[in-house]
């Protein structure tokens, strides 16, 4: 019984660890997922966005006191509009997902939700970090040297 408890605790600790992607590894995943050029957004812009939003950390969260919402995951997807965290007032959940899935190592739902975000009229400008650090900048450095 004690062995099972130790094993369960070990598995739990493994499941809550963050995955921090290397920028080239992240770029390859995005490319395979059809993000390069999606809605006119280059691969380098997506990588720049994730660098400044989460530093490629799948477990990144950021609470926004003004809207009482939280940004989740590698793309910092907001609980007010895009996912359900069960605590954000007047949440829309336009991606129809739990915010928890944005914190795991599987990026498929993060990517699908990011695609949903850029389909809105605001597009990639929905991300404040993209506007501050990537818009109208040479973002080629974010994929330079990556074997894509």
UniProtKB/Swiss-Prot annotation:
Keyword annotations of the record: Antimicrobial, Bacteriolytic enzyme, Digestion, Disulfide bond, Glycosidase, Hydrolase, Secreted, Signal
CDD domains: LYZ_C
Xref: InterPro entries: Glyco_hydro_22, Glyco_hydro_22_CS, Glyco_hydro_22_lys, Lysozyme-like_dom_sf
Subcellular location: Secreted
Keyword Secreted: yes
GO biological process: defense response to Gram-negative bacterium; defense response to Gram-positive bacterium; digestion; killing of cells of another organism
Protein EC: 3.2.1.17
Pfam families documented for this protein: Lys (PF00062)
Molecular-function GO term, any one: lysozyme activity
Entry keyword Nucleotide-binding: no
Known partners and oligomeric status: Monomer.
Protein name: Lysozyme C-3
Species this chain originates from: Sus scrofa (Pig)
């Amino acid at each position: 019984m004690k062995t099972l408890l130790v094993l369960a605790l070990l598995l739990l600790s493994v499941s809550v660890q963050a995955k921090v992607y290397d920028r080239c590894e992240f770029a390859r995943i995005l490319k395979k997922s059809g993000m390069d050029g999606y809605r006119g957004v280059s691969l380098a812009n997506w990588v720049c966005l994730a660098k400044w939003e989460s530093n490629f950390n799948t477990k990144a969260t950021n609470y926004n006191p003004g809207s009482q919402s939280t940004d989740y995951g590698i793309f910092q997807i907001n609980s007010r509009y895009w996912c359900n965290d069960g605590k954000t007032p007047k949440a829309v959940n336009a991606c129809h997902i739990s915010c928890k899935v944005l914190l795991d190592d599987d990026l498929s739902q993060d990517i699908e939700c990011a695609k949903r975000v850029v389909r809105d009229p605001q597009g990639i400008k929905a991300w404040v970090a993209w506007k501050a650090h990537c818009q109208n900048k040479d973002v080629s450095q974010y994929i330079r040297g990556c074997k894509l």
